[in-house]
Every structure is written in structure tokens, then in C-alpha cells.
Amino acid sequence: MWGYVHLISWVAIVVLTVTALLIYSKSVKGFTMLQMINRVFYILVILSGIMMVQYSVKESWILAIFKILMGIIVIGVVEMLLSYRKQQKPTGMFLMIFIIVVVITVSLGFYLSGGYPLFN
């Protein structure tokens, strides 16, 4: 169950982040609302990650710790990306970092879980 919560929350964070970036010029209020909803999903990701860490540590504790750090970095990069967008500063670098870190984190997550819940 926690695997599904974790996966759905991560997908929601990525979708909400991209949507917030796209709608900022049209609706600052909508942007702020999406940013707040994103933060709720951070809590879900952290809680579900804590519940699942025992399984990934069995696979490889080094990779599990690295994945935890990458997850925290993703949250930090999303916050920086959205705050830079709100301040109307260039976001290209953070967008590139966001894509790279998300791909690494998702790859590690599926490796450590053996593909669960998506490929099982």
C-alpha cells in the first residue's frame, strides 16, 4: 500500500510542479495554490518513504541512503524552482537539475523496490 501512496505522491509532485511553472504568468493565485498542494504531497512522500525504508535497506543500505538524500534534494530543487519562478528569476538551471534528479531518484526507487508497485 505504501508503495502506491509513494508513487502517486511523486507523480502528483511532478505534475503539480510542471503545471505551476506553466500557469504562473496567467494566475499567481493558482500558482500559489499549486505550491501549497505540492507541500502536502511532500509530507505524504516523506511518511510513505519512512514506512518503506525497511524494505530498501534490505536490498542495499548504501543505495537506500543515497535514494533518501536524492528524494530530499528533489524536494529542495522543487522549492527553489518554484520560488525562483515566483520571483521571476531564470529557472532554466533548476529545471534541468529537477529533471536529472527526478530521473535518478525514480530509477533508484524502482531498483530498490524490484519494480514494485508499477512493474509487479
UniProtKB/Swiss-Prot annotation:
Stated membrane topology is: Multi-pass membrane protein
* Keywords, ordered alphabetically: Cell membrane, Membrane, Transmembrane, Transmembrane helix
Cellular compartments annotated:
Cell membrane
Q: Could you list the residue ranges that cross the membrane?
A: 3-23, 33-53, 62-82, 92-112
Q: Which GO terms describe its cellular component?
A: plasma membrane
Q: Superkingdom, according to UniProt? A: Bacteria
Q: Does the keyword Cell membrane apply?
A: yes
Asked if the keyword Transport belongs to this entry, the reply reads: no
Q: What Pfam families does the record tag this protein with? A: DUF1516 (PF07457)
State the family it belongs to.
Belongs to the UPF0344 family.
Q: What is this protein called?
A: UPF0344 protein lin2366
